């Protein structure tokens, strides 16, 4: 049943319910990782965006990866366009905001998509939990796909998105 004007939703490599490790979320990522992101961002934002895109975001740090300089440069370009302050504060927002109750309240159909080689958002603490919390979800885990799978594997992701929307 649509909620207002929204009939369906999709989560792609999404962070909910909670990324940071807490007493209630023992499988989360230690706060020191996010502190490191903030430190790197504050020290040299341009290098931070090159390093993340060149490494874990698209899986370019994996043996045999086909590295796309265009993809790296485009991600860097997008990062540099945004506000440094917003990016810095965004790290807290995406890592420390508990969205458990929000997920439970979404009753419309939700497609949850994530790669099992996501080095940025571990799928077992994200997609698997999202699927359990969302009352009307469909889970798709993609073997070997990275966090940035919407770019690195666009044909597969787009086909599954369209199939979900049309169903």
Located regions from the model:
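Flexible "cap/lid" loop of the alpha/beta hydrolase fold
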Residues: 1-43
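Conserved hydrophobic packing residues within short motifs/helices of P-loop NTPase cores
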Residues: 10, 111-113, 140
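Short beta-strand/loop motif that positions the catalytic acidic residue
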Residues: 106, 112-114, 118
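Conserved alpha/beta-hydrolase "acid-adjacent" motif
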Residues: 119-125
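Catalytic active-site module of serine/aspartate enzymes centered on a nucleophile-bearing elbow/loop
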Residues: 135-167
